[in-house]
Design a protein with these regions (language model features):
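Zn-dependent metallo-beta-lactamase
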Residues: 268-347
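Flexible, processing/modification-adjacent segments and terminal tails
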Residues: 38-44, 51, 117-119, 125-204, ...
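Bacterial N-terminal signal peptides that target proteins for export
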Residues: 2-22, 29-30
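Conserved beta-strand hairpin/beta-sheet module of binuclear metal-dependent hydrolase folds
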Residues: 325-371, 470-488
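Active-site metal-binding motif and surrounding structural segment of the metallo-beta-lactamase
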Residues: 360-405, 507-513
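Gly/Pro-enriched, hydrophobic low-complexity segments
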Residues: 187-285, 474-476, 483-484, 489-508
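N-terminal mature ectodomain segment of secretory-pathway/periplasmic proteins
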Residues: 48-51, 55-140, 180-183, 359
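Divalent-metal (often Zn2+) His-rich catalytic cores of metallo-beta-lactamase-fold enzymes
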Residues: 502-538
Length: 538
């Protein structure tokens, strides 16, 4: 390739160096073979970018890098109000070793994350196609070791690929046909060449300053179950020497939909730092397996997964386990994962209480409903509040004709969620459906009834600081109340949220027998009252 001239032995070494990324990313999610040689313009842009980070020889000889950084992360759709704003997920300190290997890269990211005012030391460790997590991964959990699921594995690798474009250029140097030239763009008032790099998930665009060769920006796509495909922008500033001829950016910022989700400042970066294999050794008893389908999904929902990991409410894993628990006749709590739903059987159909988490979770629920209640249509799907893990699985039910029922304040938010049918990276039922969402709003005062001759269902608003869009779902025939599970978690100690819940119950004269929720277990109303009696005064 012109501009990056490789000897035969050099080309062989480059192919070996690039093989690690091909093993861990490109080869795992297959694409049709590329045809044709790289154009002269693409060759020039590639050569310019490689020269700026240190040159072809330095990149070819890059065997590892170690960085230390501090930063902050933010998350979509977890704040008190619905909209396009983000709320803080964590602050963090990070020491990371990235070991480039032909048999599959090895990564060890030692974090100290702080999401609820308490430091959580946690390490994400990857060796080839497998990984493990050591430390305190979730808020309130004890320190321990566990296998890393393949979606988290893929998300960790893809995020590091975006934050460190050297990994992308390594692939291009090994296989120049991955890169083509894209029309030039102006960025910050300066002309930039745009190198389009084929990627396992979505094409990567590297913005290269036409005068200096500096890589200033990367753009690509990612997916969010409520927001659909979202544009990801990564900006690099303050390129500095990291030794061995290599240069790395000091500050990296990742944005989606105009909002910053990840910002980090590197205090130290060292290329070709020695890395001990003991740092990647699996703990005794931890056996990770590789799941290709789960990895593919994780790579396409990178920031959704990683921002929840930073927040300390981990959403990794297949989300398909269904564990039914009958609460009362006609009301079945669906457990199996931390985000729960309830199925209410009416005479004329099914009410899905809480379309939680994601489309795969929704599909598992749909399969369960079809097995358990054959020929009964799903008439309604409710959302206890707008937070992503409580609402991300509503779309497939809407595609089947279910009417969504949400707080009236959240209607504009859900209109955007259900109106988006343009996803490419992860298409769900609604993307291929002509169904319209006839949203039913729950007012701030009063009760909305989903009528049925046998088992009507009622919804009413609950005022909480957690989310302005909170609603309760009540089945009066058996006295079953479904709560959001955040402000009060059934079975957990009662806090201020439990007291306001009790006030709402009493103000609306609800004859409650059982309380279940989006998280937690099943408690009787008597047990709830006992928990309130021993709770500290707020």
């Amino acid at each position: 390739m012109r501009g990056v001239t490789l000897s035969r032995s050099g080309a062989r070494r480059t192919a070996i160096a690039g093989g690690a990324a091909a093993t861990t990313l490109l080869a795992l999610w297959a694409h049709p073979p590329l045809a044709g040689a790289q154009s002269p313009a693409a060759e020039r842009a590639t050569a310019q970018a490689i020269r700026n980070i240190g040159g072809e020889r330095a990149l070819r000889n890059l065997s590892s890098f170690r960085l230390r950084s501090t930063g902050r992360t933010w998350i979509f759709d977890e704040g008190p109000q619905p909209g396009n704003s983000v709320t803080p997920a964590s602050t963090f300190r990070l020491t990371m070793d990235y070991d480039l290997r032909s048999s599959g890269d090895r990564v060890r990211a030692d974090y100290v994350r702080n999401s609820l005012g308490t430091d959580r030391p946690v390490s994400e460790v990857i060796a080839g196609r497998r990984g493990f997590i050591s430390g305190v991964d979730a808020n309130g959990s004890p320190a321990g070791d566990k296998a890393m699921t393949s979606d988290r594995w893929a998300a960790v690798l893809r995020e590091q690929r975006l934050l460190n474009p050297h990994l992308i250029l390594r692939d291009v140097m090994a296989n120049p046909r991955l890169a083509t030239i894209f029309p030039s763009r102006s960025l910050n008032g300066r002309p930039h060449r745009v190198l389009l790099v084929r990627d396992a998930v979505d094409p990567l665009r590297l913005y290269i300053d036409a005068r200096t060769g500096r890589i200033d920006r990367l753009t690509t796509g990612d997916h969010n179950d409520n927001r659909g495909d979202v544009r990801t922008i990564v900006d690099y500033t303050g390129w500095r020497s990291a030794g061995s001829g290599m240069r790395f950016p000091r500050t990296v910022t990742l944005k989606q939909e105009g909002q910053t989700l990840h910002s980090e400042t590197r205090s130290a970066v060292r290329a070709n730092a020695p890395v001990s294999s003991t740092r990647f050794r699996f703990p005794a008893g931890v056996n990770a397996t590789y799941d290709r389908a789960l990895a593919s999904r994780g790579a396409r929902t990178t920031e959704w997964l990683m921002t929840f990991a930073h927040l300390g409410f981990v959403k990794d894993g297949p989300a398909t386990e269904i564990a039914p628990r009958v609460v009362a006749p006609g009301s079945t709590l669906i457990q199996g994962i931390p985000n729960q739903s309830m199925i209410v059987e009416q005479q004329d159909g099914i009410v899905v209480v809480e379309g939680a988490l994601s489309s795969p979770r929704a599909e598992a629920l749909i399969a369960y409903i079809r097995r358990s209640f054959p020929n009964k249509p799903i008439r309604y799907v409710t959302g206890s509040h707008h937070h992503a893990d409580h609402s991300g699985g509503m779309r497939p039910f809407v595609a089947l004709g279910a009417r969504p029922v949400v707080h009236e304040v959240a209607i504009p938010f859900y209109q955007r969620v259900f109106g988006n049918k343009s996803s490419r990276l992860l298409r769900d039922r609604l993307d291929t459906s002509d169904a319209d969402a006839n949203i039913l709003g729950v007012p701030a005062t009063g009760i909305v009834t989903l009528p049925d001759p046998l088992r009507p269902v009622q919804l009413l608003a609950e005022r909480t600081e957690h989310a302005s869009t909170t609603v309760l779902v009540f089945v009066p025939r058996e006295g079953v109340l479904f709560v959001n599970g955040d402000t009060y978690t059934p079975g957990a100690p009662a806090g201020p949220g439990a007291r306001t819940l009790d006030q709402t119950i009493r103000a609306n004269n609800l004859a409650v027998s059982w309380i279940v929720g989006g998280h937690g277990g099943v408690v009787s109303y008597a047990q709830f009252q006992q928990a309130l009696a021993v709770a500290p005064a707020s």
